[in-house]
Amino acid sequence: ALMRVEGTPHSWPDAQAAWDEGRMSRWPDAKTAHAMGYYRASDIPFQFALADAFTLCDAYHCSIQTGTNTNRLMLWTGTNDPGGKNGGPAIGNSHDNVPSLGGHPQDYTWTTYVERLGKAGITWRVYQDMADNFEDNPLAGFASFRQAFAGAPGADPVLKELGLGTRKLDGLKADVLAGRLPQVSFIVAPAAESEHPGPSSPAQGADYTAQVLDALTADPKVWARTVLFIMFDENDGFFDHMPPPVPPSRD
């Protein structure tokens, strides 16, 4: 099979059209015929081996029928601010970096999960290359993190170090071996290893996941008490025959 394929449309208008209020009947029209493609087990043996060996969440859907950053906001904060009271509603990728690196100048101002973890005394860190994270770290859109990144007076420098700093997989392994792995860690892959169609491929994504597993299993005692979630923020636009569950319409 062709490993490196181009992505399909996966933004708010085309995703809403493909979903079609749950009918799921307009996928090729909204996202091109390419959206009906798929891989067999022989094409992606590493991913199938993981699925066979570990728990597979086979009812795993996007939180919102749109693109990357909105769904990452749901994962990292629990909302996209649908009422628009704190910089939302977020339906696109406008806030996927700090303003000095091209992000939208307006801040998101609601509270993220990592801030709640910190206030509860739970340790956390983001492992990433801030210069090459495929703009997939949603913390870069939030006022408190942007202020810390810019070194603003009164900002909390810990938010920059833990949330918007650079600590890659070698740092993850070092932390495992030194016994200082946080209680909660987020790992953001570089573009080439993100498994995202276009810049990456299933083979490259498999290699990155294998490196994460190698780091976590470097200390068997750490691995024994670790839960690893391998997560995708959305479907890129490739077809899923199962309609996602939705809340009742307010209308």
Regions from the language model: what does each represent?
Residues 1-251:
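N-terminal pro-sequences and low-complexity stem/linker regions of secreted or lumenal proteins
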